[in-house]
Amino acid sequence: MEYKNYTAYQHGSEPAVGVLITNLGTPDAPTKEALRPYLKEFLMDPRVVEPPPARWLWKLILNLIILNTRPAKSAEAYQEVWGKYGDGSPLLDISNRQLMDIEEKVRAHFSGRVEFALGMRYGNPSIASALKSLQDRNVQRLIVVPLYPQYAGATTASTFDAVSAELQQWRWIPELRFVRNYHKHPGYIKALANSIREHQAEHGKPDLLVMSYHGIPQRYFDNGDPYPCECRATSRLVAEELGLNSDEYMVTFQSLFGKEEWVKPYTDATLKSLPDKGVKHLQVICPGFSADCLETIEEIDQENREYFEEAGGEKFSYIPALNDRDDHTTALTQIILQQTRGWPERDGFDAEADKEERALQAKLADQLEKKLSDEFGQ
């Protein structure tokens, strides 16, 4: 492997802590031309689609069939949500606001230099480009915060893969901490409960609260992925915070892809069946999505709303993702602060004394270099 050279080490350069916030990603535009490379990158990730041993067959299906049919359909869906939370993709617009809020809150607890970047697993800005921007700012300690509350191989582990792939090419890697999950973090649970209470204060209490999470193939769970268990743990804690009985809420899984069995129950099939079971007023929240995106805005609030109403449901409302709510970004800040304990740039760090020490070390290094040069030549 060839390592990417940066610059020669400079004595006295000011180091920084880097905070890398990541999420899944988004196409550059709501067009089939932009969707094709985005979907290809996504569906070629072996963490997302674990194909049979004949991987060449999956590549053939992907390139000859899926990438010639799905981009146009996906582009139409993205056009429905584009600009809803800003000028472009909802996920990217919200993620940028989250980053700004987190940065402001985290900086208050750092006396040393701390730098921030946003990276998407697929599309732009990429994780690689975000890491390079942190490298340019002399980041020597790095915390990676994937905004996936529940761990899954297809999301969290894939993020780790992307971070590792870039850092493997660096000659000097930073000290690294990686947030694996936060599905039971008290601040996250309280933020979810607060959002539900606020929604119900305006829209009333439903017959049933559905907590819908992105699904994974049953095969992944059978092979050891803890994701469904962590989804159910989150839901149980939120229900306890709200004082809900077990018959007042349920957990479902959405966004199925392909023909194999995924973890159940499925969100769409569930919503179609609920009116016949007496559920006329339904509220849905998606706790696993840290920001609203195509899967929540279009799939839940539009498509699944129609399923419920066409089956006889009378009142449906979607409870938005936590997005850039203050209690959400506060919870994420708490997670970052907990994970960076012990780093010298944190609270109590004497930045001026550190600057003086670095200047002294640089001066001594220059003196030594001059002495060696005088004695031994170039």
From Swiss-Prot:
Fe cation binds at H214, E295. It comes from the Bacteria. Coiled coil: none annotated. The gene is hemH. Belongs to the ferrochelatase family. PROSITE patterns: FERROCHELATASE. NCBIfam families: hemH. Catalyzes the ferrous insertion into protoporphyrin IX. Pathway: Porphyrin-containing compound metabolism; protoheme biosynthesis; protoheme from protoporphyrin-IX: step 1/1. This is Ferrochelatase. It comes from Hydrogenovibrio crunogenus (strain DSM 25203 / XCL-2) (Thiomicrospira crunogena). Keywords: Cytoplasm, Heme biosynthesis, Iron, Lyase, Metal-binding, Porphyrin biosynthesis. Its EC number is 4.98.1.1. GO terms for biological process: heme biosynthetic process. Its main location: cytoplasm.
